[in-house]
């Protein structure tokens, strides 16, 4: 595995960011804006058409993700709707679309959340990642702390390697 740790892609990585929230708009979407800022640092491209907000509704989430799966993106990151509240349905919308689940992502995210961020409240997270054909999907909580942890500790360090493995 060590031979792939510093994989460099010969192209720009294209991402889509979906915020799932009944209350956020583009001015108040701190989680989605945090994703955009952290991706921009690594020259990951997110066009205006690939950043949006939908309500906590399974059909709305599924429809948007399916639309982006048909477009020229490498990775889709959803924020919000991953907890256990009645309205938290992101996982129910995304998981059935996955070809393969990357179980280690959710396990490591919850572990790091426990150790570095929220303690035992980490057990409330149902964060998930997986693949759909040659695309990656990550569904993470919407708090900026969770977004930073997921992107800085897990997603960004492995993104090129994951894309390389999916497309080789």
UniProtKB/Swiss-Prot annotation:
InterPro entries cross-referenced by the UniProt entry: MoaB, MoaB/Mog-like_dom_sf, MoaB/Mog_dom, MoCF_biosynth_CS
Pathway noted in the entry: Cofactor biosynthesis; molybdopterin biosynthesis
Keyword RNA-binding: no
One GO BP: Mo-molybdopterin cofactor biosynthetic process
GO CC entries: cytosol
PROSITE patterns found in the cross-reference section: MOCF_BIOSYNTHESIS_1
PANTHER family documented for this protein: MOLYBDENUM COFACTOR BIOSYNTHESIS PROTEIN B (PTHR43232:SF2)
Family in the record: Belongs to the MoaB/Mog family.
Protein name: Molybdenum cofactor biosynthesis protein B
Gene transcribed to yield this protein: moaB
